[in-house]
Amino acid sequence: MFRKKLNQKKLLYEVSVIRPLIITLLVLLHSFTKIAKGAGGRCNDYQLIEGYQWLVWFIQGFRIETIALIAGYVFSYQSHDLGRSYRFWPFVWKKIKRLIIPMLVFGVAYYIMFIYSADTFTVKDFIVTLLSGCGHLWFLPMLFWCFIAIWLIDHFKLNSWWLLVLLAAVSVIPTPQLPLGFSRLPHFLFYVYGGYFLWTKRDWLFEHCLSWRWIIAFWTLYVILVMVNHAILPEARELTGTMGKIAEFGLGRTTKLLMAVCGIMALYLTVCHFTTQEGFKPKSWVIAASDNCYGVYVYHQFVLTLLYFFTPFVSFVHPLVVPWLGFAIIMTVSLLLTWLTLKSKTGRLLIG
């Protein structure tokens, strides 16, 4: 029943809702977490109010992982339901245009504005930094490699529960610092493939789990795991010797994995509970917001850094109000810049 309904529409309504929601949470999160380094260093002693700190932790648990999952989810939909098939090199070029070229264009601007220093500049460091993704753009080269891996999985029909479990295990293994997006690849490949896998099991999931009982269960588990990760495990990490290492690399990483999975499933099932109802259709502004997500992601860190680091904004506004007002300014300006960029052909090629 669900599959038939989905084939009759071109948009994935759940994606049209989840994508702008997650980007909004991402901007909100950064509006809180970047304050301490804001105002040109004049507010390095700024401390988040305890309630705000918990808000950050609840958002932080699954927001960027959800973006990765949605990428694999849409790829799987296009492959399995729309029958889209790409040869390898045309697919690589498509993702270069979509991810790598915007990373380079905006990365150069970010480097010049916020990283460049005549005293420490070297061509080698510039190239490595640029190709690894300047600032928040690190997500783009990492996602590029995830797409290459997912193409191979799809092409050679490797989709299975065992692969999902294997990638989950790999995602919790510490990785060394590597350039070009490879450091975070093992962690995020699990979520991209998780989205791919989720689409293939979507009908089964809806048949067995699309109820408020499961939704509440996932949200409850997520809240518990957030509290464990931020209230209990920090004390365990202070232990020395073997027990401390187990807490740090075993329990800590496993808890974060379970926390992200529960948060993603809670959000996904909550949204799908509404989007699968007969006659549901997102408002036009929701679809428009989904189309603007890429631009908001790219621009928000530019606006945030300028606002927090190069103006006295943080010093002049009451601490209770700073993150909320900062969020409103950052989101508004990012949307405006996205709208202006999409008016040009070049802009549409970059973030359209």
Place the predicted regions along the sequence by residue.
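Membrane-cytosol interface segments of multi-pass membrane proteins
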Residues: 1-168, 314-352
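Hydrophobic alpha-helical segments of polytopic membrane proteins
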Residues: 156-166, 197-223
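Alpha-helical transmembrane segments and terminal signal-anchor/GPI-anchor hydrophobic tails
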Residues: 207-287
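Aromatic-anchored segments of alpha-helical transmembrane domains
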Residues: 24-31, 108, 165-179, 218-232, ...
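Juxtamembrane "helix-exit" motif on the non-cytosolic side of transmembrane helices
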Residues: 115-120, 173-178, 227-241, 309-314
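Specific transmembrane alpha-helix
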Residues: 64-77, 141-151, 180-208, 256-277, ...
